Curated annotation (Swiss-Prot):
Binds 1 [4Fe-4S] cluster per subunit. Belongs to the aconitase/IPM isomerase family. LeuC type 1 subfamily. The lineage of its organism: Bacteria, Bacillati, Actinomycetota, Actinomycetes, Frankiales. Keywords: 4Fe-4S, Amino-acid biosynthesis, Branched-chain amino acid biosynthesis, Iron, Iron-sulfur, Leucine biosynthesis, Lyase, Metal-binding. InterPro entries: 3-IsopropMal_deHydase_lsu, Acnase/IPM_dHydase_lsu_aba_1/3, Acoase/IPM_deHydtase_lsu_aba, Aconitase_4Fe-4S_BS, Aconitase_4Fe-4S_dom, IPM_dehydratase_rel_enz, IPMI_cat. CDD domains: IPMI. It comes from Frankia casuarinae (strain DSM 45818 / CECT 9043 / HFP020203 / CcI3). It catalyses: (2R,3S)-3-isopropylmalate = (2S)-2-isopropylmalate. It holds the Pfam family Aconitase. This is 3-isopropylmalate dehydratase large subunit. [4Fe-4S] cluster binds at C347, C407, C410. Its EC number is 4.2.1.33.
Amino acid sequence: MGRTLAEKVWDAHVVRRADGEPDLLYIDLHLVHEVTSPQAFEALRLAGRPVRRPELTLATEDHNVPTTDTLAPIADPISAAQVEALRKNCAEFGVRLYPMNDPGQGIVHVVGPQLGLSQPGMTIVCGDSHTSTHGAFGALAFGIGTSQVEHVLATQTLPQRRPKTMAITVAGDLPVGVSAKDLILAIIARIGTGGGAGHVIEYRGAAIRALSMEGRMTVCNMSIEAGARAGMIAPDDVTFEYLAGRPRVATGAAWEEAVAYWRTLASDSDAVFDREVVIDAASLTPYVTWGTNPGQAAPLGSLVPAPADYPDAAARASVERALTYMGLTPGTPLSDVTVDTVFIGSCTNGRLSDLRAAADVLRGRRVSEGVRVLIVPGSMAVKAQAEAEGLDEVFRAAGAQWRSAGCSMCLGMNPDTLRPGERSASTSNRNFEGRQGPGGRTHLVSPAVAAATAVTGRLTAPADL
């Protein structure tokens, strides 16, 4: 019987297999940031162990860093302590670190791909759930906990139980104006936040193949919001063109050899998935979340749902709680919902193509009065590229704030937060209660929808401007 892409990568990395025990996997790349690593390094220190493969480990400061005055000391003492601990630990254990103000600094899931570290057929881990981003390259990439971070630092291996596999085929072509973010929100709305639990999702079909690498990263990034262990897309010429010439990618004969191997990384025609889902791309429109989990999403042209629309008692209770928290009334057009803040950035949508999409909407327009707009590049390299193209001038002319790189308003762990009761249109990946600050209300959208919303002050598709 044939094997799926996930099974091929998994099998190639099994160091030890025994009945009744998890497989022991070799890890090709370990990404590290300041929040989930301090205890892991301290455990190594107490045990007198080195980092096993420091050359396969890369660290960056992203979660806690400010995006305005990056030369001043970090004001929050806990955040400052975590950043300082990462610097100390990387220096002591010989791990390459990209600190604040370094040209290479940025969100860990933006930095890895832009350096060419994320490659097809690899196993990639990080103490961060959105490690699934790197699956866009045909890598098996997943988040791990702090104790597992220690295990990988010490051994470059990780015990893991073999996951199930799921195929999500997006048939046909996406309509004009529908982005990768709209697609993944629609997928999560369809299968639910637990729909991928215990599975590695492989995204397939014409619509997936038509996506750029950055669009593919957006889709794989939010696999975890569907409950999946990881998300993957088989590598193809789009992948190879993206990787060619990047700093950490082979050249010459070694490159040709790598590409030849990467071309074998596709699910066999007779591979059997544990679950299969088909999505009709042509039926999709811009999507937005209305509730407090990413599965509570709907087309932007629809109405706020009512609890009575749901047959299950638990679902009705969840919807009622979400509407209460979000301050929404059933039957309200989603396009009538006003916002206080727009955030464009994050490891989901903080890449150059995302900023270009936002700039295309904002060019020649002004931000609605009273709306705060934060545009935060995913890395300092993305920031430099955007400025070279003049995108920062477009944003400033529109009345938006152009920031330095970091996780920013994706999560309430740095100065960029919502105040209680404030409502945002956000290109990030989670809309949980308090995710962007205590009492903050978050609507997940694409960069283009976020930019259009900034112009009108209410949830808006660019086509409606």
